[in-house]
C-alpha cells in the first residue's frame, strides 16, 4: 500500500513549468507579419518557445532561413507568404487561413529606410507613397482581412508597432528629418486608434506598441543620425520584445486604443 501511494503521488504531482506545454490544437495562435528578421523574428521565436502556435509571414519564405530553422526546432511555426502592402496577397493569405482562429495579430511590417533620402531637398512623392503603404496601409489591410479569424480567437488582440518619433507630445525633443518615416507612423497610429473604436463592439483590443530604440535592420547603423536621447535609450531586441509580449499579456478592453512602450509605460499621442 505504501508503495502504491508513492506511485500515485508521483503521478499526481504538478508538472514542472517547462513541461506544462499544451497541445498544438489547444494552444493560442499568434500571427506575426514581417517575421523573417529583426523584431518580427524575435516575436515569432518567443511565442513559439512559449508553446503558442505561430503563423509567421514573409515576402520571400524560401529565403527566410532563420524562420525555417525556428520552425524545425519548435514544431510550432507555420510560415506563410505575404506582401502586406499588396491587397491580393493579403486576400490570398486570408483565404488560406479561413476558419483558423487567431488570438493575437502582430502588425510588425515596417521600414525606417535611409535617412539621407528623407531630408528637405531630396524628397520624392513615390518614395513617400512606399513608406505609407509599408508603415500604415499594411496594418489596416491585414487587420481588416483577418477580422473573422480574430473574432473566432479567444484573446482577440491586435497590435501595431510604431515609434516614439511619431508622437506629437514628444516634440521638440525629437530630431528633425525622417519625413516619410515619421509621417507614415503617425498615419499608423490613427489607423490603430480607428480600429480600436470600430472593434470595441467585437471585444477586440487594439493597441500601439513602441519597441524603443533597438538595433535592428530598421535602425540606422550611423548613430549620428540619432538624437542624443535616442542613443541613450537603446535597448536589445530580446528585452524589447519580451517587454512588449508582457504588455500584450496584460491587455484588457480598458487599455484599447492606447499606446505603450515596451516597458509598459503609456506614451502620449
Describe these PLM feature segments:
Residues 71-88:
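Rossmann-fold cofactor-recognition segment
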Residues 33, 102-112, 135, 160-162, ...:
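Rossmann-fold scaffold of SDR-type NAD(P)-dependent oxidoreductases
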Residues 36:
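Conserved glycine-rich cofactor-binding loop
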Residues 50-65:
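Conserved glycine-rich Rossmann-like NAD(P)H-binding loop of the short-chain dehydrogenase/reductase
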Residues 201, 208, 220-269:
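C-terminal helical subdomain
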Residues 169-171, 210-223:
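Short beta-loop-alpha junction of Rossmann-like oxidoreductase domains
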Residues 111-112, 118-132, 137, 151-201, ...:
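Catalytic loop of short-chain dehydrogenase/reductase
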Residues 84-100:
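Conserved Rossmann-fold cofactor-binding substructure of NAD(P)-dependent oxidoreductases
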Amino acid at each position: 500500500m505504501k508503495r502504491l501511494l508513492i506511485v500515485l503521488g508521483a503521478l499526481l504531482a504538478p508538472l514542472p513549468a517547462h513541461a506544462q506545454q499544451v497541445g498544438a490544437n489547444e494552444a493560442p495562435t499568434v500571427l506575426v507579419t514581417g517575421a523573417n528578421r529583426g523584431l518580427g523574428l524575435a516575436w515569432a521565436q518567443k511565442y513559439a518557445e512559449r508553446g503558442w502556435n505561430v503563423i509567421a509571414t514573409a515576402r520571400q519564405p524560401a529565403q527566410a532561413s532563420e524562420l525555417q530553422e525556428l520552425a524545425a526546432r519548435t514544431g510550432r511555426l507555420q510560415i506563410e507568404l505575404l506582401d502586406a502592402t499588396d491587397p491580393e496577397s493579403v486576400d490570398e493569405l486570408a483565404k488560406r487561413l479561413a476558419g483558423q482562429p487567431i488570438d493575437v495579430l502582430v502588425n510588425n511590417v515596417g521600414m525606417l529606410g535611409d535617412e539621407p533620402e528623407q531630408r528637405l531637398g531630396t524628397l520624392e512623392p513615390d518614395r513617400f507613397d512606399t513608406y505609407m503603404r509599408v508603415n500604415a496601409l499594411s496594418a489596416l489591410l491585414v487587420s481588416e482581412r483577418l477580422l473573422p479569424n480574430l473574432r473566432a480567437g479567444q484573446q482577440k488582440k491586435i497590435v501595431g508597432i510604431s515609434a516614439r518619433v511619431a508622437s506629437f507630445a514628444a516634440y521638440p525633443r525629437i530630431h528633425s528629418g525622417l519625413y516619410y518615416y515619421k509621417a507614415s507612423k503617425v498615419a499608423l497610429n490613427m489607423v490603430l486608434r480607428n480600429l480600436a473604436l470600430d472593434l470595441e463592439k467585437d471585444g477586440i483590443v487594439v493597441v500601439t506598441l513602441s519597441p524603443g530604440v533597438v538595433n535592428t535592420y530598421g535602425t540606422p547603423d550611423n548613430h549620428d543620425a540619432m538624437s542624443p536621447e535616442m542613443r541613450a535609450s537603446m535597448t536589445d531586441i530580446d528585452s524589447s520584445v519580451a517587454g512588449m509580449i508582457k504588455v500584450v499579456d496584460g491587455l484588457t478592453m480598458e487599455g484599447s486604443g492606447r499606446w505603450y512602450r515596451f516597458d509598459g509605460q503609456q506614451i502620449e499621442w
